[in-house]
């Protein structure tokens, strides 16, 4: 291990007093993710002035009232560029996402729902009654390149105003980096998942992305 660290085949970073060991390319990807999320979160945004009234309209249409934490999440989603919504099964994530989606669709023409796998995307579509795709399909794989490249990237950005990403704990670091690279500079990113699920890869998000809700 010492030899790998001294040759920089492995690298370390310390967060909150804990030292982590990285492969260089994954460390670079995580730092790029943190920087991109930080840039997105600094773009000015304000919640619609009618937001509370709009939430009440949704409640009346559905015949139930949102829990205080759900209302907080909805307000946060409509007033932030970057948000993390996390909770275990039965905590109301789907109901909250549906409310957020309804409000976003009233404001924007281009809202995308995606997930890391086809099964997760199908489930997301069923729960929201809204078209959802895998991240790969959203970015569109360029099969002519001979390697894993995407048609949508920094030079050919996605046209969406909002991207809601489900099953976030299962998203590969490099894939998430590619998604952020293809997002427009003022895009809203909502990351949804279960904090208690085993993550596929560790993503450290720095201070600029602090708008989040954890239940």
Segments (PLM) and residue ranges:
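Conserved ATP-binding/catalytic motifs of P-loop helicase motor domains
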Residues: 1-206, 210
């Amino acid at each position: 291990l010492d030899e790998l660290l001294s040759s920089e085949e492995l690298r370390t970073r310390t967060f909150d007093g804990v030292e982590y060991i990285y492969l260089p390319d994954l460390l670079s990807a995580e730092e790029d993710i943190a920087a991109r999320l930080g840039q997105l979160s600094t773009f000015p945004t304000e919640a619609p002035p009618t937001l509370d009234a709009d939430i009440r309209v949704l409640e009346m249409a559905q015949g139930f009232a949102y829990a205080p934490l759900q209302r907080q999440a909805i307000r946060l989603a409509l007033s932030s560029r970057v948000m993390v919504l996390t909770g275990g099964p039965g905590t109301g994530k789907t109901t909250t996402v549906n409310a957020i989606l309804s409000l976003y669709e009233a404001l924007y023409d281009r809202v995308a729902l995606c997930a890391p796998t086809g099964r997760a995307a199908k489930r997301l579509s069923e729960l929201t009654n809204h078209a959802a795709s895998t991240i790969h399909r959203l970015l569109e794989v360029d099969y002519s390149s001979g390697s894993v490249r995407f048609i949508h990237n920094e030079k050919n950005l996605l046209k969406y105003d909002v991207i809601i990403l489900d099953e976030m704990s299962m998203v590969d670091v490099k894939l998430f980096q590619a998604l952020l690279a293809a997002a427009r500079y003022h895009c809203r990113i909502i990351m949804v998942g279960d904090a208690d699920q085993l993550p596929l890869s560790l993503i450290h998000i720095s201070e600029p992305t602090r708008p989040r809700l954890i239940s």
